Amino acid sequence: MRPSELLAALHTAEKLKDTTRHCYTSGGRHESVAEHSWRIALMAFFLRDEFPEADVDKVTRMCLIHDLGECFTGDIPAFDKTAQDESTEEALLYQWVASLPSPCREEMRALYDEMAALETQEAQIYKALDKLEAVISHNESDISTWEDHEYDLQLTYGEQNVAFSPYLTALRQAVRQESLDKIAREGDRRK
């Protein structure tokens, strides 16, 4: 990749630093998409020994690129995102990926296709980490930032995505317990 091509790609990806997500940080500000992507990549790094048969380097690459479409559309929370939103994001993302030089263009497109199919262990791990990180982040935020429907969502979100792995199922149960403990400690503030 020529320096000018790298810089152009980085300038596009930089938008994720300012693209906020629905969730707040423990410090009380909106989390950025870049921070979310970084942390699921960190989760993949920490969990590499739990999945010795998986290509965790590939999982990490998936984690790093999974939300790049939000450079063009912004973040839409999962509970608000429509099929049209997903289609628009995918079209804009694939248009951008097509503008990248080889072999990056082909690798990214192959990763996105694999992630969408959710047939490989690597894609399943990435998707589970994506869901888990969102719930962990909500547990770290002040409960006053939770919307009413999130009390129930905190207890169930991502369960189907972790079911393939005993380790991730146990992690989901631990995160669920953190949610229950948080609600008990900070109180149910639903309106």
Provide a role label for each language-model segment.
Residues M1-K191:
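Active-site helical microenvironments for divalent-metal-assisted chemistry
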